[in-house]
């Protein structure tokens, strides 16, 4: 009976050793993953969208800036004048469009009707005169030239009458739809020009897009800039990202949302906390900046890690050690 008992105990011990070894191996696989990266360098060149003479600059190299802060201004005068012109253009176009919609006043219609009566009387007189001249020409009393003059006067009076009748007809029926549409299009064009003038005036003031530190100041007050010319280069300080690389064997551990610990040489015992925000969908050869020798010939995937408790001591370009593990994953 003792021999089976000993064998049973040996099997139990062996199973425990195997299970413990497997657990240790898995924990080492998970907890032991260490990556090396750098704090991402994020800079932006700031410029005016419009051109002009630099009136003032409010910051200098090394200054900390806040989102929404005024950094500089161009001479506003040209853009203020353009805005006034655009507003006047809208007023003129609006008045013309309103006239087209309203049609003609009763007084204008009455004047047009009176003009028709006057033109009708002139035509009747010219027609009668021409008829008389025709009879005289047949009796050889007047020359052919006199008859032609009478015909010309009659034709001119007829044209004047037709013009007056057309004008009265237009006044009574109102403006044509095509004319109204053209006036509306002119108004919309003037409104668009006004919006552009307002935007240009607004863009003659340079506003900080986000928090950061001013690295370089490329111009001074009095400089005449073309649109898009660089004025400042700014280092963006928030959010802080760490760029690291992981090989395919450990890719399953580097999933978006995974929490990690971030160590720097200046704080070896007080890590920062981060969370994986992005994993590149494509592999690439390891950049030269990666410090791990065994990764330099591998294809790796780029990670972006968002630092959740960053401070001013975490500077761009600084090397960082990224530690995976249960402690990081559950904090």
Swiss-Prot record:
Coiled-coil segments on the chain, per record: 107-208
Presence of the UniProt keyword Oxidoreductase in the record: no
Superkingdom in the source lineage: Bacteria
Main location: periplasm
Keyword Coiled coil: yes
Keywords: Coiled coil, Periplasm, Signal
Signal peptide: 1-15
Annotated InterPro entries: CusB_D23, UPF0194_membrane_YbhG, UPF0194_transport
One Pfam entry name: HlyD_D23
Subcellular location: Periplasm
GO cellular component, one term: periplasmic space
Family as reported in the entry's similarity comment: Belongs to the UPF0194 family.
PANTHER family hit by this protein: EFFLUX SYSTEM COMPONENT YKNX-RELATED (PTHR32347), UPF0194 MEMBRANE PROTEIN YBHG (PTHR32347:SF29)
Protein name, entry field: UPF0194 membrane protein YbhG
Name of encoding gene: ybhG
């Amino acid at each position: 009976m003792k021999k089976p008992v000993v064998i049973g105990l040996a099997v139990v011990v062996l199973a425990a050793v195997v299970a413990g070894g497997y657990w240790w191996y898995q924990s080492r696989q998970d907890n032991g993953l260490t990556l090396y990266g750098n704090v991402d360098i994020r800079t932006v060149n700031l410029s005016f969208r419009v051109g002009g003479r630099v009136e003032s600059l409010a910051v200098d190299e090394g200054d900390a800036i806040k989102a929404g802060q005024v950094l500089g201004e161009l001479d506003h005068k040209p853009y203020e004048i353009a805005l006034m012109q655009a507003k006047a253009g809208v007023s003129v176009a609006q008045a013309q469009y309103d006239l087209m919609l309203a049609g003609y006043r009763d007084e204008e219609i009455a004047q047009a009707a009176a003009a028709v009566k006057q033109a009708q009387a002139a035509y009747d007189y010219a027609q009668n005169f021409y008829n008389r001249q025709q009879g005289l020409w047949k009796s050889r009393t007047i020359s052919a030239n006199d008859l032609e003059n009478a015909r010309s006067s009659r034709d001119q009076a007829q044209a004047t009458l037709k013009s007056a009748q057309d004008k009265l007809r237009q006044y009574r029926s109102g403006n044509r739809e095509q004319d109204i549409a053209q006036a509306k299009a002119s108004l919309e064009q003037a409104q668009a020009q006004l919006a552009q003038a307002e935007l240009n005036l607004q863009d003659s003031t340079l506003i900080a897009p986000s928090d950061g530190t001013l690295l370089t100041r490329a111009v001074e007050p009095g400089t005449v800039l073309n649109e898009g010319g660089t004025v400042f280069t700014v280092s963006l300080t928030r959010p802080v990202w760490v760029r690291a690389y992981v090989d395919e064997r450990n890719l399953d551990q580097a999933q978006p949302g995974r929490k990690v610990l971030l160590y720097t040489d200046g704080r070896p015992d007080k890590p920062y906390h981060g969370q994986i925000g992005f994993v590149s969908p494509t592999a690439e050869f390891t950049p030269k900046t990666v410090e791990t020798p065994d990764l330099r010939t591998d294809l790796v995937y780029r990670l972006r890690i968002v630092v959740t408790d960053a401070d001013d001591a975490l500077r761009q370009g600084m090397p960082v050690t990224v530690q995976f593990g249960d402690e990081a994953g559950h904090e």
